[in-house]
């Protein structure tokens, strides 16, 4: 049988001081949705989810954040620079307004985008991303760099994790800047991101809903892809959960 899996278009685009690698599927004329991966992951983590979005007529773009995969490995890393990269990527692709989906660190980046240029985000999905801590946590134990090659730059871990773990008294006020309809997806007690933490985010974003996929853990879209799709598809595509489809093989 002839496969109807969507064609994956691989590309790179130079923006400011970096080159960003990305994967694109679906109709170039479809409503765009940009997918942002977690720390240490990459664009390919969204392959199955992106294919299903493409089957619903969406233009799907998943990028490697700086320091990951085929994108530039740079001298400095921060959530702000990653946010700048995503906004520059939208400009380079000619995308004025988009849906945005982010997992973990990618969710933190997506939130920054939706705060800084609220008019550019139509719908926002944030998967298991914690808010800043209420107080400074205990220091993390040092972790030794693995001997085997990694698909990301080891040097980016410390500054990004430090930024995520730093208390930020103004975070609630900045979440009020988000005008996009927002869906938070949590992984339940099996995740290190507590339901209470996600509830604080849910209470701060003006137009927001929180859904928990019980026992999914931190990587909801990978560990529980069917449940993740059933939750996110109606929000992004207006697809009833009982009518979700996947590309045929």
Residue map of PLM features:
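N-terminal cap/lid segment of alpha/beta-hydrolase-fold proteins
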Residues: 2-19
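Conserved hydrolase catalytic core segment
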Residues: 96-133
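Conserved serine/cysteine hydrolase catalytic core
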Residues: 163-204, 209-212, 221, 225
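Conserved HGGG/HGGXW glycine-rich cap/lid loop of the alpha/beta-hydrolase fold
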Residues: 21-70
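Catalytic active-site module of serine/aspartate enzymes centered on a nucleophile-bearing elbow/loop
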Residues: 208-209, 214-249
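Helical cap/lid subdomains and adjacent loops of hydrolase enzymes that gate the active-site channel
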Residues: 127-177
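Conserved acidic catalytic loop of the alpha/beta-hydrolase fold
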Residues: 83-98
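Conserved catalytic-core motifs of eukaryotic protein kinase domains, centered on the activation segment
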Residues: 45-47, 71-76, 136-137, 195-196
């Amino acid at each position: 049988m002839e496969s109807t899996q969507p064609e994956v278009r691989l590309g790179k685009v130079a923006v400011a001081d970096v080159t960003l690698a990305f994967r694109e599927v679906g109709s170039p004329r479809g409503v765009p949705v940009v997918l942002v991966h977690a720390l240490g992951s990459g664009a390919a983590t969204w392959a199955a989810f992106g294919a299903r979005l493409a089957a619903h007529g969406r233009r799907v773009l998943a990028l490697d954040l700086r320091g990951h995969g085929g994108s530039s490995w740079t001298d400095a890393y921060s959530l702000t620079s990653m946010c700048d990269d995503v906004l520059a990527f939208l400009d380079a692709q000619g995308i004025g307004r988009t849906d945005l989906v982010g997992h973990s660190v990618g969710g933190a980046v997506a939130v920054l985008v939706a705060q800084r240029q609220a008019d550019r985000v139509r719908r926002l999905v944030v998967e298991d991303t914690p808010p800043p801590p209420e107080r400074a946590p205990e220091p993390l134990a040092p972790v030794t760099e693995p001997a085997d090659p990694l698909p990301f730059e080891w040097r980016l871990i410390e500054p990004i994790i430090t930024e995520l773990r730093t208390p930020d008294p103004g975070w609630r006020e900045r979440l009020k800047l988000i005008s996009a309809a927002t869906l938070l997806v949590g992984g339940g007690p099996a995740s290190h991101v507590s339901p209470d933490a996600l509830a604080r985010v849910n209470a701060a974003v003006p137009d927001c809903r929180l859904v928990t996929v019980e026992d999914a853990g931190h990587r909801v879209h990978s560990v529980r892809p069917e449940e993740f799709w059933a939750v996110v598809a109606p929000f992004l595509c207006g697809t009833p959960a009982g009518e979700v489809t996947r590309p045929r093989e």
